[in-house]
From Swiss-Prot:
Its main location: cytoplasm. The keyword Transmembrane does not apply. This is Glycerol-3-phosphate dehydrogenase [NAD(P)+]. It is an enzyme of class 1 (oxidoreductase). The active site is at K256 (proton acceptor). It holds the Pfam family NAD_Gly3P_dh_N. Its EC number is 1.1.1.94. It is found in: Cytoplasm. Sn-glycerol 3-phosphate binds at K173, G201, K256, D309, S319, R320, N321. HAMAP family: NAD_Glyc3P_dehydrog.
Amino acid sequence: MTSANDKSTDTNVDSTQAEQKMAEKQNKLLSGIIERATKSGIGRKKLNPSAVESAVAKNMAEIHNNPTKLRLVVLGGGSFGTAMANLAARNGCDTTLWVRNKRTVKAMAKSQMNKKYLPGYKLDDRLKYSHELQAAVKDTDIIFIAVPGLAFRETLKSIAPFISGQSIVSLTKGMEKDTFALMSDIIKEELPEVNFGVMSGPNLAIEIMKNMPSATVIASESEPLRHAVQAALHSAFFRVFASDDIRGVELGGALKNIYAIAMGMAAAYEVGENTKAMILTRGLAEMSRFGVHAGANPLTFLGLSGVGDLYATCSSELSRNYRIGNMLGRGMTIDAAVKKLGQTAEGVNTIQQVHEKATKEGIYMPITHALHAVIYEDKAALGVALHLMEAGFRSDVEFVMEHDHSNASLTAQMQTANNQAKNEKTKPDNK
């Protein structure tokens, strides 16, 4: 005879087992979606957009048949690359961090720490490490590239023989020296068949490692890739937003470094809040002006990858470009400042590239030109700043609808509505 307690126990066991099975089913479904989302059927063979869409649809339809968790590799063991690899591993992704130096890999695996760039921050136990490029890249779904801009093209060439359907996401901010190419341009040149995206935002690596709430933007023309990156990195402390404006998101991440250097220099002179606000907002104006000229959506610069990244980089002493600017403001040469920093500050190269491009194309970039004069032409910073303040009159806000056009449009709409109302009144009564 079965007691009431026995029946209650059996019911609880059955309920627990059912919940476990449901959770397993949901996990399998999600992991399958993630993998299929990153597989758009693009290998070394060049496909047209409709074929890619068909491949994505086919893969999504097969999500129940071959579920597996997302497999990632992050190329580059700097602070941000390490932080992203750690975040993905913590989210349960099969994640490998590739670092070129074998000795560094052994040290990181042993200590579970990146002592050079993130000392004192323990990395997730599940994170794997490798110095062998082929082994790290093979059989992955997404390749995140977090190497300095100077090494970006060479890295793509190195992994080209091992690409067999993986998607690529650039974490590198800046422009290639001498070519003015953004990282997305380099991807299209070196691996034209690959599905790709770029990620950028106000992402100071140390704050991410401290679990301070942060957010970023993944930009790609591939919606499945955007969703996959969100699934891989999104957490209670790190939110991933999506965009399809690759140009705007990438330019925001590259151009803001210029104004971080300017803000660092200003801080060295102990300027007031008015001056800081002026540099920040006029820097944003330059970013959006340059971005629109390059084909970006000006509204993108009002988001995380624009004003968000600009604010974080310009207001934090953790920013490498801010620190470079601060050292320059205290009288150090650019070479000495870069050497003391010990890390790559992409803004130094970006200033030169944007100055040349803006001069050639006639884009109004006064702060950029002023920084170029100080860093590369050995001009006195205070003299250049005074010249900036004495520049001619300009409008404040750009990229808004002209008032005449706006009023004319509104007047036309009101007139149309008025005419329709009159017509309704003059219609004969059919009652």
